[in-house]
Amino acid sequence: MNTEILGVAVQIVLMVVLAYPLGRYIARVYKGEKTWSDFMAPIERVIYKICGINPQEEMNWKQFLKALLILNAFWFVWGMVLLVSQGWLPLNPDGNGAQTPDQAFNTCISFMVNCNLQHYSGESGLTYFTQLFVIMLFQFITAATGMAAMAGVMKSMAAKSTQTIGNFWHFLVISCTRILLPLSLVVGFILILQGTPMGFDGRMQLTTLEGQEQMVSQGPTAAIVPIKQLGTNGGGYFGVNSSHPLENPTYLTNMVECWSILIIPMAMVLALGFYTNRRKLGYSIFGVMLFAYLAGVFINVGQEMGGNPRISEMGIAQDHGAMEGKEVRLGAGATALWSVTTTVTSNGSVNGMHDSTMPLSGMVEMLNMQINTWFGGVGVGWLNYYTFIIMAVFISGLMVGRTPEFLGKKVEAREMKIATFVALLHPFVILVFTAISSYVYTHHPDFVESEGGWLNNLGFHGLSEQLYEYTSSAANNGSGFEGLGDNTYFWNWTCGIVLILSRFIPIVGQVAIAGLLAQKKFIPESAGTLKTDTVTFAVMTFAVIFIVAALSFFPVHALSTIAEHLSL
């Protein structure tokens, strides 16, 4: 047990320590300063020339968003065409068939918005061709899209007054070539050394220790897993994700993959401070996020390593904790750490089954996604926190009788309305769709039965499974309580709608706020200015997040995870 706790502590320390130099590097990349990765410049120029991009052309916030949305619309069509025709495409040695239109819609939307919700199993639901030219391609593009959006916001924050926020295409390309690709190559090399497969052969036929014949899938796993983790994507190459011994063979690969989930989101927060020359602001935001993350780790590690009281009542020893749904080679501690790490970000990959975690652990996992502000996805995670900063500035200004200002710009009714709409959209979408699914399940049992029955667990946990699915979709996470039978018309279409609403409306709102503030006249700091880089303001922001985001979900948790915990 002590060894497991030590492993958890080492991973967290590595994340925090290495996030600092990476944050400095990311800030320099987006500022256009000289870095070791300048050798990528000729490749970038070729990309710009082929695509007809002028990287020096500045965009206002409307042009920036237009480019972002056009890019996503194009790749959606690309993905749909390939997924519904993959059975006839090359690199398909196992003869996997095409996806149905509803499943392809859900898959394509899910990976296009960086969620990676999977209503299929990777070994049989995709081919090597679509794994590479849809899934892996989208995992680079969507991660870079979020990073580009944050780069534009950082540029607007650093300027005293400007009409432009940078070039979306330029930020997108350098996010791939100078940040995501180099890190992916390093992680991929480690995975190959540890035994993760990398090739294009079909299934292997093996004889197990019991003498049974078994077919084992392989493929270009080591190429896809690194960006799956680093881009906070999370879509597993195999159906059970990083629980699979070929996707995550050893404790070392588990540490590397878990580290990969959080390193860029952490670094992006620190990059904000370096880019804007306001390090104290970056540190204060980082501190709030780290506090919330560590609180979740403390709860989940304690819950999972403490075991299940129902099993203890039967007189069965649980020296290794609550091991249901966990890999013996990894242990309860490492699985608990991963469960928090993957949900404070929009990653969603798993190394154990969240459906089998203790009720309070499941509540923490869901709350991380429902708050959707602690580190979050690469780039987009900080933008969600930015929304609450605007709200906290406005509320604090009203409380002390000062004009609300953020970084020398007045925060007025227009910005506050957008921020409020974005903040309330998240709980609204989750709770409304959960209510709809619960209503359909209760009042239309024939329809539900025609789709396989949906729930493998009734009662409190059945509600948790439905709530988790929509929470994961809205938070662009992609993990799930897998007791839910989700590859149906109802879940494919409704989750797809939630994915679209919860990805693009917040990004549009957040970039719009940044663009509107950037255009305003800069007001120098004075004795009456509300400082936003202090511990007091950090606590105020945390309080606003807790009240607006967390408490919105208390009633539904009282009916699901909390009720289940009290029933043990």
UniProtKB/Swiss-Prot annotation:
The chain crosses the membrane at residues 3-23, 64-84, 133-153, 179-199, 255-275, 281-301, 375-395, 418-438, 497-517, 535-555. Keywords: Cell inner membrane, Cell membrane, Ion transport, Membrane, Potassium, Potassium transport, Transmembrane, Transmembrane helix, Transport. It comes from the Bacteria. GO terms for cellular component: plasma membrane. It is a multi-pass membrane protein. The keyword Transmembrane helix applies. It is found in: Cell inner membrane. The keyword Transferase does not apply. GO terms for molecular function: P-type potassium transmembrane transporter activity; potassium ion binding. The system is composed of three essential subunits: KdpA, KdpB and KdpC. Belongs to the KdpA family. Part of the high-affinity ATP-driven potassium transport (or Kdp) system, which catalyzes the hydrolysis of ATP coupled with the electrogenic transport of potassium into the cytoplasm. This subunit binds the periplasmic potassium ions and delivers the ions to the membrane domain of KdpB through an intramembrane tunnel. This is Potassium-transporting ATPase potassium-binding subunit.
